[in-house]
């Protein structure tokens, strides 16, 4: 009788669902966080592309300087990311305009605006998993427009 009760308890699967949930839930949460973080990186990349295009559009207009373009690009990135408190050095690390002047020497010149931004995957959480080469990527956006006279 006692032997039969012990065998029945050993074969019982009570609590197995909780153990399976404890094993699967962290993996599932990490996958969902990765999907959300990838979507945020794509949103940041699209914002940088739009900001580069806006900067190039401003740069081809007469009377605008490189500082004007940098200010507009930084404003666009801040509005696009919703981070109004971010400083320009953390939002846009480089704005390159080629040629670097308000008006080029010849009328058919092209203006290229290049933006770079370092995106940290999973934010500060990536350091918990050892970081590595996939903890951050450099997003680069470039837009070229021809100056019409």
Predicted regions and their residues:
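Alpha-helical assembly-interface signal, strongest on the long, hydrophobic N-terminal helix that forms
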Residues: 2-75
């Amino acid at each position: 009788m006692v032997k039969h009760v012990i065998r029945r308890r050993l074969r019982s699967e009570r609590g197995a669902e909780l153990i399976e949930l404890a094993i699967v839930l962290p993996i599932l949460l990490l996958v969902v966080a990765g999907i959300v973080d990838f979507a945020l990186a794509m949103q940041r990349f699209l914002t940088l592309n739009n900001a580069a295009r806006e900067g190039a559009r401003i740069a081809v207009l007469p009377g605008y300087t490189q500082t004007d373009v940098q200010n507009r690009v930084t404003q666009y990135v801040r509005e696009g990311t919703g981070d109004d408190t971010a400083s320009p050095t953390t939002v846009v690390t480089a704005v390159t305009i080629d040629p670097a002047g308000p008006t080029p020497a010849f009328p058919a010149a092209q203006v290229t605006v290049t933006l770079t931004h370092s995106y940290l995957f999973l934010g500060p959480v990536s350091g918990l998993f050892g970081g590595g080469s996939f903890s951050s990527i450099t997003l680069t956006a470039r837009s070229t427009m021809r100056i019409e006279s």
